[in-house]
Amino acid sequence: MVPRNDPEAGRPPLAPRLFSRFSQLSKHSFLSYSSSFEADDERSSTGSLENFGIMSPGRSRSNSGSGSSSFGALPPRYPGDDTRPTSPKELAGWYAYAFAAEVYVICGSFIPILLESLARENGVLLSDRKTPCGSSSDKNGDNGGQCIVYVLGMEINTASFAMYTFSISVLIQALLVVSISCAADHGNYRKKLLLAFGWIGSIAVMLYIFVSKNLYIFGALLAIVSNTSFGASFVLLNSFLPLLVRHHPEIIDKEANIVPNGQDAQDHEDLDGETAMADSTAALLPRGSLEDGNALSRVQTREELTSHELNLSTQVSAKGIGIGYIAGLFLQCVAIFILIQMKNTTWSQRVVLFVIGAWWAIFTVPAAMWLRPRPGPPLPASSRHTGIRAFIAYTFYAWKSLFRTVQLARRLVDIMLFLGGWFLLSDAIATTSSTAILFAKTQLHMEPWALGMINVISTAAGITGAFSWSYISRRLHLQAHQTILACIALFEIIPLYGLLGYLPFVKNWGVFGLQQPWEMYPLAAVYGFVLGGLSGYCRSLYGELIPPGSEAAFYALYAITDKGSSVFGPAIVGAIIDASGEIRPAFWFLAAIVGLPAPLIWCINVERGRSEGEKLAEVIEGFKVTRSPERESDEESRAILDVYDEETDR
């Protein structure tokens, strides 16, 4: 670095080679895409002069409105990178899949209800192992005894049958998510896999129409397939979120207006071709431009841009959650109408699930039409294989990448803090929902239509929460992680309220502490309102911490943490039910698992995590940024990379 007092410091750089840009163009071919890369009618070339630095940011923005979507885009990071600005139609495609698939989560409570009903129809009382069990909605139907069913020669409580089924499904889901993460991050597979899993899951849900009393094991298999497909598809959907935000026109404009010295780019007028060549040797540019080694660095304005991206990501994520909840609320009302009209039989529950699957399949079509594939960098090994060999190569590389991603994540403090908290929090969310539904059905003896009303209230509150938490956080000046902490505090009310039933004086009242069916409804409102905030804020917060270029790989780690933890929660609750014969003791476990994530979330620093992620992105395949010698020699910037290089060289 040249000292400030050196007389050579004020000397301008040598005149650039006037036609070196065009010489560079001769070494590259313009990017072209087949129709499989395009979203409906948006088939504009992504190869532009602006990608090679010929057009200034100001001009590219002015031209973006004239019809070429490539102008104003960020420069490509790898061959085939789709750098077109995010369009309203592409966002609509992303929202469309949330509208299609979120109904599975919201209406999916009918699956454990149906599984418990089918298991109970095949079960016997534990007291004599001969007497058939009655309906769980009948307070006297089981004579107060536990009901068990034989599965593969093992005795299982019918209330825990669904819990074990979902534990198995999330275990398989975690393995599947790892295997497909590489195909999603590399090449043009992200969208294809999303649609494939969407339609596989929807068909599995529709097949419940054929599940009768004697096919309850088949019903459990369908639950595993549908839940696995749903989880895999949402990992792929979530991996689109950072890309949609990164290429959003608002972010591109913010990026173009930022220079390293913090001044607005509009303060420096673009030079025309002849003027620029005539004055190329004159020291007319500010010192910041002369010393700039990286046109995309945001040294003094990183916090502002990070905050803007996080806000936009939160808005898009929350809107997607809200749209999905609206779809679920409508379908819940339809489901309750079907249950009432068909007398609350298992047949009516199967019809409801068929409608849910059909909804999922039909509304996936708009996502297929409008969502762009946004391909990732090509995998070098895949060029040598085709067909099944290519799939094996992708799978092998995916598992190898997982261990590398874990190594990378270990160097990102805020990623590790978030994943640790999310491991516990996601388990609490999934386990609380299924435990509450089974508690209402088996302990409070609520009818299926009444259980449907729980979901309606929860969904309506979720819609309110999805659109209200952003206002609450702005009003109270809360950061993203502080909003998550507020949601956790409200969430803790649910298990603590269930534990009130153990207090002798509350038990003598015969009300409060979940002793009456109506008490489920206000708790459902709390659960929905909390989930509306957690779903959007956790997803967007994590997206801001991910190193650019590895969205699917890190969202696979996110899903493994999410779904992998859900293996333990339902299994532990199932073991508690088998040991105690009732569900209420499980609230002790839920109270602990809801509160434990709070200290980890509190320690997250978004700005620090974003900075570390960008530094680490340099060693992840498919992402390279040219840095100035000054920045390359900076010890702080190289600290993470040096440690990683040492590990990979071993």
Swiss-Prot record:
Record-linked Pfam families: ATG22 (PF11700)
Keyword list, A-Z: Amino-acid transport, Autophagy, Glycoprotein, Membrane, Transmembrane, Transmembrane helix, Transport, Vacuole
Composition bias type Basic and acidic residues, residue spans: 628-639
Compositionally biased intervals (Low complexity): 56-72
Residues linked to a glycan: 311, 344
Annotated compartments: Vacuole membrane
Superkingdom, taxonomy of origin: Eukaryota
Membrane topology field: Multi-pass membrane protein
Function: Vacuolar effluxer which mediate the efflux of amino acids resulting from autophagic degradation. The release of autophagic amino acids allows the maintenance of protein synthesis and viability during nitrogen starvation.
Family label: Belongs to the ATG22 family.
Protein name: Autophagy-related protein 22
Protein source organism: Chaetomium globosum (strain ATCC 6205 / CBS 148.51 / DSM 1962 / NBRC 6347 / NRRL 1970) (Soil fungus)
